[in-house]
Amino acid sequence: MLRTSRRRRIAATALAVGSIAVLAGCGTSGGSSTPTEAVDELGDYEGEVSIIAWAGYVEDGSNDPDYDWVSGFEEKTGCQVTSKTFNTSDEAVTLMKTGDYDVVSASGDASLRLIAAGDVQPVNVDLIPSYEGVYDFLKDQPWNTVDGEHYGVPHGYGANLLLYNTEVVTPAPTSWDVVFDKAGDYSGKITAYDNPIYIADAAVYLMTHQPDLGIENPYALDETQFQAAVDLLKEQRQHVGEYWSDYLKEIQAFETGDSVAGTTWQVIQNVLAGEGATTDVVLPDEGATGWSDTWMISSTTEHPNCSYAWLDWIASPEVNGVATSYFGEAPSSDAACDYREDCEAYHAGDADYASQIWYWTTPIAECLDGRTDVECMDYSAWTEAWSEIKG
């Protein structure tokens, strides 16, 4: 039985990617044995599979006996699961380079690095029955498909929303201006996500409020566009009471009143609402950044059959419904909503809602919006600028 309450142990989807130099500077970790094409058929299960994932993605009942989707997989396949959690995409990329793990749950900021370095292999989605039911708007996306080649199976997705104190921030906001141009109204009580990727949030805002900048993609910023986003965040800094990456700290800040407006995840609002806090969330008119995670298979795995079995299992309706509910995000299919009670809160399957989300993507010098007459600022520049923004 699923429950709508959210425990404070639900994992934060922290994002802290490193320099994009890894894309150009690293070869494959598997040498000549690295698969360049997806497999055509599967064989017998190997009896084990090693998985690295965000906390809350591979639950065996040890954290909460009501949430266990590992035991059923082991019983069905005979593949014994060992798992390790990571806290950042940087950590995930580093761990996959060791070749010690078979499967990884990768956010969009990590997936392309893994693909470019040859650390993950193409996936034959025809061998994964559950893939057929996955929402179309999660398939064939830049973070999971390259040159028509699939590299994994979508898991869950969500938007970075605007959280606000309903008693303090009135009328109810519909724009990100409450944390940018109007941040002075709540100076010292604005909160922002503590990561260089937050520069994209400023870029999303500027797409609407400074259209002359010509920003078409918040992860594809030339020097002028990038500087405008950085300047906006430097102006915001004087009004920020706390930069957060630990979701528990944001919950506490809104409970105590230390924060009254800022970026958040739906799961944080769920926890606050469950505890009676006077808060609400909105996806502002300008749109928002967000995430879409992908299950991927190591290019050097010695357990491809168990790995494929996991990708099919975790995308199956009941398991995906339970797993994404536990974590606090929308599932990957309509069928998964039959096994959870809160799909409406997460706008699951709402393509129009999803179209307002700019999913996390690693910025690179080759502009992701297709421009070839300029060079865009890569993630190393974003990282350097973030240090300057915070001071």
Question: Where are each of the predicted segments found?
Answer:
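Extracytoplasmic ligand-binding site segments that recognize negatively charged/polar headgroups
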Residues: S50-D64, S105-A253
